[in-house]
């Protein structure tokens, strides 16, 4: 079955399968951001607080598992040696990552069809990224920044898994 993505959650623009949605001033993620986000920078958004919520939508309820891929990098320093990120989707816990390296991170989680909420034929969901080690650089003497940072979000993509060939 082909899943046709488009607006399902009120006010949320289409999510096209396999097409990255970029964060930042030049990206298209802004309408998907619900709460817990700092102002856009050129090519990314930081979370601002312990939770950051993101809306996803599809025109039809998916009949197969989809994957959410999020690219970014953690806020780390000598006083913040790691970031733990838990992903909830419509209340279900879908993933946990412990990140202790500054290089780019790929967070990937499977979203089963039953995790989506339906409205008419459309499907929608709310991703909540819980980042409990988010810190204000000002509070730990690292900068004058008052934002509560944990992860720098660069892009997200909804993808359908590629079927495995038998043989």
Tell me what each language-model feature is.
Residues 1-63, 76-80, 132-167:
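Glycan-recognition and processing domains
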Residues 60-62, 91, 101-103:
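Short loop/turn positions at the edges of beta-strands in beta-sheet-rich folds
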Residues 120-136:
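Cysteine-clustered segments with highest specificity for TGF-beta superfamily mature ligands
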């Amino acid at each position: 079955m082909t899943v046709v993505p488009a607006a399902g959650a009120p006010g949320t623009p289409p999510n096209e399968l396999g097409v990255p949605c970029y964060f930042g001033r030049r990206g298209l993620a802004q309408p998907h951001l619900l709460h817990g986000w700092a102002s856009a920078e050129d090519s990314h958004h930081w979370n601002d607080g312990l939770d950051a919520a993101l809306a996803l939508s599809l025109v039809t309820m998916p009949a197969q598992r989809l994957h959410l891929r999020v690219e970014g990098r953690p806020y780390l320093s000598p006083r913040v040696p790691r970031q733990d990120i838990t992903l909830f989707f419509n209340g279900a816990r879908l993933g946990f990552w412990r990140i202790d390296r500054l290089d780019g991170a790929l967070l990937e989680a499977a979203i089963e069809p039953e995790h989506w909420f339906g409205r008419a034929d459309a499907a929608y969901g709310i991703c909540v990224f819980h980042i409990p080690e988010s810190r204000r650089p000002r509070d730990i003497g690292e900068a004058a920044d008052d934002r509560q940072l944990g992860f720098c979000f660069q892009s997200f993509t909804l993808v359908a898994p590629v079927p495995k060939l038998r043989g």
